[in-house]
Swiss-Prot record:
Keyword Methyltransferase in record: no
Main location: Golgi
Protein's UniProt name: UDP-xylose transporter 1
Cellular compartments per GO CC: endoplasmic reticulum; endoplasmic reticulum membrane; Golgi apparatus; Golgi membrane
Encoding gene per record: UXT1
Species, as recorded: Arabidopsis thaliana (Mouse-ear cress)
Length: 342
């Protein structure tokens, strides 16, 4: 029971860390890109991953965690896939309207549910599907303003959805099947994610912004915000792997939409961004969907635990009489042996 409570506290801690760090990095990057004019998102992400790897390497050398070797091919392919998915999401934003980009992010949940159902035989109850539907409708109402389609943008969005879904499912599957921690997986895959983004980032950013990251004027305040962004990113990357490993890819996506609602609310209240009753209604519907999802998942988890416990007790009841009978027969045999002339 104590172990179960400790596990629940670990999950809550991971969720809180993910929300706090993600909202913080959005605020930091908004200031960096909007106010200070630094538009190189893909290159910045490669720096995030480099700093994450360096931080974890120092932690490893100081014996904060134990490294567990993972098959190199698995790590390389996993790292490259995650790096490509980040690049595709950025390209999708560049080729599509903001509204269609938001639709792309919303589509990740149903695609993840579909893939886990088809390939991992995972079951999602109708109640959980309904709560996810409410969540997606709410976030859609709150954040989607325009939907402009084009062929290249649509193809990039589909590729971004596919790579993101597969990458997040693998993040969960690798941790469970290879029995590695989120820290061990991130430590070994981060260099490959960083490498592909470091090489492709300047080209992607130049194509999207028509600016060169190497000729940008790096004032002290810009360098300060980049450093802060990289430090927060360590927590973001760590908590991402932690949440997906402890919960599921779908739960991580639900958490992502909670962050979206918090960022929107932050913009409305503190930055005085324009908002309408539609935005507020969308956020409320999304929050209701999240609460229902959390409740239904909790009920399903308790039901599964109770079923597991009852099965275990049932097995005990089945085996006890047999053991008793075996001992009794053994005792009778001993008595016969004593009186036997042989």
């Amino acid at each position: 029971m104590g172990e179960m409570k400790s596990m629940q506290m670990g999950v809550i801690g991971a969720l809180f860390l993910s929300v706090a760090s993600s909202v913080s990095i959005v605020i930091c990057n908004k200031a960096l890109m909007t106010n200070l004019g630094f538009p190189f998102a893909t290159t910045l992400t490669s720096w995030h991953l480099m700093v994450t790897y360096c931080t974890l390497h120092v932690a490893y050398k100081l014996n904060f965690f134990e490294n567990k070797p993972i098959d190199m091919r698995t790590v390389v392919l996993f790292g490259l896939l995650n790096g490509i998915s980040i690049g595709l999401l950025n390209l999708s934003l560049g080729f599509n309207s903001i509204g269609f980009y938001q639709m792309t992010k919303l589509a990740i949940i149903p695609f993840t549910v579909l893939l886990e159902t088809l390939f991992l035989n995972k079951k999602f109850s109708q109640k959980i599907k309904f709560s996810l539907f409410l969540l997606l409708v709410g976030v859609g109402i709150a954040s989607i303003t325009d939907l402009q389609l084009n062929f290249v943008g649509s193809v990039l969005s589909l590729l971004a959805i596919a790579t993101t879904c597969v990458g997040q499912i693998l993040t969960n599957t690798i941790q469970k099947r290879l029995n590695v921690t989120s820290t061990q997986l991130l430590y070994q895959s981060a260099p490959f994610q960083a490498a592909i983004l470091f090489v492709s980032g300047p080209f992607v950013d130049k194509y999207l912004t028509s600016l060169n990251v190497f000729s940008f004027h790096y004032s002290p305040i810009v360098v300060g915000f980049i450093t802060l962004s990289c430090l927060i990113a360590v927590s973001v990357n760590f908590s991402t792997f932690l949440v997906i490993g402890k919960t599921s890819p779908v739960t991580y996506q639900v958490l992502g939409h909670l962050k979206t609602c918090l960022v929107l609310a932050f913009g409305y209240t503190l930055l005085h961004d324009p908002f309408t009753p539609r935005n507020i209604a969308g956020i409320l519907i999304a929050v209701l969907g999240m609460l229902l999802y959390s409740y239904f998942c909790s009920v399903a988890s308790k039901s599964k635990q109770a079923s597991s416990d009852s099965t275990f007790l049932g097995k005990d009841r089945d085996t006890t009489p047999l053991l008793g009978q075996e001992n009794e027969n053994h005792h009778e045999a001993k008595k016969l042996d004593k009186h036997s002339p042989v």
